[in-house]
Amino acid sequence: MKRVFIFSVIAIVISLCGVISNEKSEKKPNRVEVISNWGDGTVKEERIYHDGDVVEIITYFENFKINTKGRVKVEGKEEVRIGTWSSFYKNGTHWSQSEYSNGVSDGGYQTWHPNGNPNIIGFYSNGVETGQWKFFDTTGTVVKQYNVTPG
């Protein structure tokens, strides 16, 4: 009797695994849409549609290196920035990175000099500068800093 029960439980688990894996495999793959092209036909801007209402937007320089990259959440006819947004120099090195929540700067903010050294490091909370902000020269030396923590 115990064996029948154990085999029944195993059979149920295996059949449920099949249902779960079928549900996962039925998800639509991300859809990529080219919005615009450069004169030579290379992609200038593309959008990658993820599950739900999240769209990743990537823009490119003429040399096909990434210019900007980030995600938006589509709310009706509006798109609001969410998560990490990055911008790059034409040679591919980071220019800036900032965090967004519901279209508002919220989290770390950083820019870099063309040589890769930090330029500005700071934080936002609900669109307002907060905490310690540091400014660097091209050699990476702090030239200015201030604290904008409320209170």
Where do the model's predicted regions map?
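Positively charged n-region of N-terminal signal peptides that target proteins for export
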Residues: 1-4
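Short amphipathic alpha-helical "recognition" segments used for binding
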Residues: 6-7, 101
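Bacterial N-terminal signal peptides
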Residues: 8-15
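Periodic aromatic/glycine/histidine/acidic cluster detector
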Residues: 17-112, 117-125, 130-136, 141-151
